[in-house]
Amino acid sequence: MGIELKKKCNYALVVPTSMGIRITPSNGQPVHCGGMAMMQVTSAETNVASVASYLGLPVKVLTTFVKGSPIAQLIKDNLRSRHMDYEGVEVPQGGPWGYRHQFNIADSGCGSRGPRVWNDRAGEVGRTLNVKDFDLDRIFGKEGVQIVHLSGLVGALSPETSKFCLELARAAKKYGTKISFDLNYRATFWKGREKELSAIFAEIASVADVLVGNEEDFQLCLGVKGPEAGGKGLKAKIEGFKEMIRRVKQAYPNASTYGTTLREVVDTNHHLWGAIMSAGNEWHVVEPRDITVLDRIGGGDGFVGGMLYAILKGWEPEKWVQFGWASGALATTMMSDYAQPADEDQIWSIWKGNARVQR
C-alpha cells in the first residue's frame, strides 16, 4: 500500500524551519576544553530534506533571516549548495542585542564519554516565523507541494511558529498535499505552554498522513502510553513499541504511516540502530543492528528523510523503512548533521552491510 501523492507539483518536499549554526569542537573534544572548532549550518528540518535534495528531488525551505547578517548569507549559500530553494523575510537585527540565528554548541563525544549539546537560542530570529509572511495559496495551490514536513521543534518555538505550523497543515489539507509530522518533543520548549501545545500538536497529528516520533515524543506530546524511554534490550521491547503505535493509530487514525526509531547506545561510537513502521495494516521492522557512529546528531532526521524520499519515489512500503534506516545510519557517519548521499546505491549499500570500496 503506497501513499497517493499530488501530481504536477513544483516541489516534492517543503519544510518550515529556523536555521542556525552548530559549533563543534574538533576531534571529538569537549566544549569546555577549548581549542579549534568547526562552524556549520544546521536545522533538524533541513536535515530531513537533505536526503531528497541530494538525490535530485525539488525541495523548498520556508524560514526567516536576519537582514544583512553574514550568518544569514552563510545559511543561504549552504542551502543553495544542498540544492534547496528557500523563501523567507529579512528581519532587521535591531542592534547588537537584537535578533540572530541560533547557535547549537555540541561536541560529538568519544567512546565512553557521551556527546553534550548546549542550545544558545536567545534572540532567535526563527521564533518570528509568521504565517502572514508567506502566501500559502501560492505555495500549495499555484506552485504545488507533494509533502510538507512539519517538526515539533518549530511547532513549539513560539506562539507565532505554533500558529504557522497549524496554518501550514490546514493549507496542505486544503490543497491535497500530504503532511508528515515528526513530534520532536523538547521539554524546555514546552515549559509553561503545555496545555496550548498539546492542543496544537493534537490538531496537527489528527490531519497528518505520516506520523513519526520516539517513545518519549508520543507520550509527552500526544499523551499516548509507551515503553520506557531509552535503555538496554530494545530488541526485546519491539512488541511494546508496536503496542504504542497501535494506540497512536487508534487515537490518530487519519495517518496511514507511523514510524519510530530504536537506538541502544553501547558507547558513543557504537550504537544498535533499528526502526519500526506501520503502513496500512502491515508492520515493517528493522531489528536493531550494529552501526559505527562518528557523530550521532541528525540520525533520526536522516531516518525520516530517507523514509519520505522512498514515499516520494513511489516504492513499496517495505523499502520505506529500509531506506530510512540506512539514511539515518549514513547521517551518523558525517559531521554535517545531515546525510549527503552521493546516490541511492550508497544508501542501499549501507542497508546491505557492504562497506567495500567502490571503484
What are these regions (language model features)?
Residues V59, Y86, I179-F181, V212:
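Hydrophobic beta-strand scaffold residues
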Residues F134, S162-E167, R193-A202:
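Charged helix-capping and loop-helix junction motifs
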Residues L55-L57, K174-G176, V207:
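Helix C-cap/helix->beta junction micro-motif
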Residues T268, W283-G353:
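Conserved post-catalytic alpha-helical subdomain immediately downstream of the catalytic base
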Residues M1-V31:
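Positively charged, low-complexity intrinsically disordered leader regions
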Residues Q40, N47-K60, S81, A310-K313:
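Alpha-helix C-terminal capping segments
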Residues F189-G280:
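Conserved phosphate/ATP/ADP-binding segment of small-molecule kinases
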Residues V59-G152, I347-R359:
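Conserved N-terminal subdomain of the carbohydrate kinase-like
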